[in-house]
UniProtKB/Swiss-Prot annotation:
Compartment(s) where it occurs, according to its Swiss-Prot or TrEMBL record: Virion membrane; Host apical cell membrane
TM ranges: 23-43
Remaining remarks: When the channel is activated, one or more imidazole moieties of His-37 probably become bi-protonated.
Organism: Influenza A virus (strain A/Malaysia:Malaya/302/1954 H1N1)
Name of this protein: Matrix protein 2
Chief localisation class: virion
Role: Forms a proton-selective ion channel that is necessary for the efficient release of the viral genome during virus entry. After attaching to the cell surface, the virion enters the cell by endocytosis. Acidification of the endosome triggers M2 ion channel activity.
Signal sequence segment: none
GO annotation terms (biological process): protein complex oligomerization; symbiont genome entry into host cell via pore formation in plasma membrane; symbiont-mediated suppression of host autophagy
Sites annotated Essential for channel activity, possibly by being protonated during channel activation, and by forming the channel gate and the selective filter: 37
Activity regulation behaviour: The M2 protein from most influenza A strains is inhibited by amantadine and rimantadine, resulting in viral uncoating incapacity. Emergence of amantadine-resistant variants is usually rapid.
Subunit structure as annotated in this protein's UniProt entry: Homotetramer; composed of two disulfide-linked dimers held together by non-covalent interactions. May interact with matrix protein 1.
Free-text note on domains in this protein's UniProt record: Cytoplasmic tail plays an important role in virion assembly and morphogenesis.
Length: 97
């Protein structure tokens, strides 16, 4: 009984791999998927804060302020700032000088 497998066979006094079917489309597809998975995983680890912040808050920029009086713009800015200052039911009081 031999301990050698089909993959590990002695070829010319060295251990090697017989890869006669390396042009098989399934092997090529699996290699491409593996490489893409590795690239996406690396990008995810490098930029996870930016990526998940975009998913959480979206790309909201707010409504256009064109044609709106400056007093209303300032009121809207204060409302938005107070909404940002509230963090998971912990409200932050900011005193202006």
């Amino acid at each position: 009984m031999s301990l050698l497998t089909e993959v590990e066979t002695p070829i010319r006094n060295e251990w090697g791999c017989r890869c006669n079917d390396s042009s098989d489309p399934l092997i090529i597809a699996a290699s491409v998927v593996g490489i893409l998975h590795l690239i996406l995983w690396i990008l995810d680890r490098l930029f996870f804060k930016c990526i998940y912040r975009l998913f959480k808050h979206g790309l909201k920029r707010g409504p256009s302020t064109e044609g709106v009086p400056e007093s209303m713009r300032e009121e809207y800015r204060k409302e938005q700032q107070s909404a940002v200052d509230a963090d998971d039911s912990h409200f932050v009081n900011i005193e202006l000088e």
